[in-house]
């Protein structure tokens, strides 16, 4: 089921239906910039391919089921956004307390996890086919360490597992239905704001604030809700690597080239 926004665009009424709609979107959904001209652009369809591959990995390799605990301990990155959305796709509970699955980039981040059964080692490099760090160094932090980049491409492009129930919790005391309702409300604000470039052109993308990170369950939820809100508003998500010391003019030029704008914060 879908409803109509005031602009006439159809808006999926559940998270599962939103994912279905996103999978048919040919226009950009996620744009990532990092050092040395690194640029990743994912259409809605390609983003959902990555999300669904990751969700299948979580289910088939890590035995993650709806309601099972999942933890992200990593900075903002296009791959951590994918993994966070994959956890929602599966219906996981975002919880740091002895999660079944955790995901990290580094050994330092692994030290912040709490005895996961499975630890996903994720690499930052844009075209990494495997983890370039020391997998052995991560082995003391989990029962099993898995190389996310080496494994994820082998999984199906369409999610084949169980879909989450809207009444299930995504955080303790906070359901999937409540989370999606919050994302819809924020999306409506973004949709009606009429964001535009200084030239007057309509903005095609909104910047995901570099203040977001995946270092606590609540922080992960906040970041994912913002991603969902931007996508639901009809914009792409623009992410500039927060680990880079961007010069104002450099970042402004990148954003202008993508017709992206910063979301004003009160």
Task: Locate predicted features.
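Actinobacteria-biased recognition of intrinsically disordered, low-complexity terminal regions
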Residues: 1-26, 249, 257-258, 263-266
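Long terminal accessory regions outside catalytic cores
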Residues: 1-11, 34-40, 46, 55, ...
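Extended, compositionally biased accessory segments flanking or bridging domains
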Residues: 2-5, 16-42, 48-49, 142, ...
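Flexible, low-complexity linker/hinge segments
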Residues: 4-13, 108-116, 120-202
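Polyanion-binding and phosphate-handling cores
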Residues: 13-23, 31-35, 45, 52, ...
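Conserved AMP-binding/adenylate-forming core of the ANL superfamily
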Residues: 30-64, 157-214
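Conserved AMP-binding/adenylate-forming
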Residues: 57-93, 97-98, 195-235, 239-241
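Conserved ATP-dependent adenylate/AMP-binding module captured primarily in the ANL superfamily
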Residues: 93-114, 127-137, 141, 188-204, ...
């Amino acid at each position: 089921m879908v409803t109509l926004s005031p602009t006439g665009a159809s808006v999926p009424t559940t998270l599962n239906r939103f994912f279905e709609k996103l999978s048919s979107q040919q226009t950009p959904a996620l744009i990532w910039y990092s050092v040395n001209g690194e640029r990743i652009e994912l259409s809605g369809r390609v983003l959902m391919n990555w999300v669904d591959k990751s969700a299948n990995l979580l289910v088939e390799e890590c035995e993650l089921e709806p309601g099972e605990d999942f933890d992200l301990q990593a900075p903002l990155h296009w791959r951590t956004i994918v993994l966070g959305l994959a956890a929602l796709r599966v219906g996981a509970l975002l919880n740091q307390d002895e999660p079944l699955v955790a995901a990290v980039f580094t050994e330092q981040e692994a030290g912040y996890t709490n005895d996961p059964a499975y630890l996903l080692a994720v690499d930052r490099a844009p075209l990494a086919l495997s983890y370039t760090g020391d997998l052995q160094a991560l082995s003391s932090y989990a029962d099993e360490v898995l190389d996310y980049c080496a494994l994820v491409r082998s999984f199906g492009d369409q999610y084949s597992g169980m879909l989450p129930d809207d009444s299930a919790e995504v955080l303790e005391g906070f359901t999937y239905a409540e989370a999606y309702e919050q994302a819809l409300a924020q999306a409506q604000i973004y949709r009606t704001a009429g964001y535009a470039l200084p030239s007057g052109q309509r903005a095609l993308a909104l910047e995901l604030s570099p203040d977001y990170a995946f270092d606590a369950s609540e922080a992960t939820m906040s970041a994912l809700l913002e991603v969902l809100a931007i996508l639901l508003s009809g914009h792409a998500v623009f992410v500039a690597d927060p680990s880079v010391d961007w010069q104002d003019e450099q970042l402004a030029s990148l954003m202008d080239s993508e017709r992206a704008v910063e979301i004003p914060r009160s």
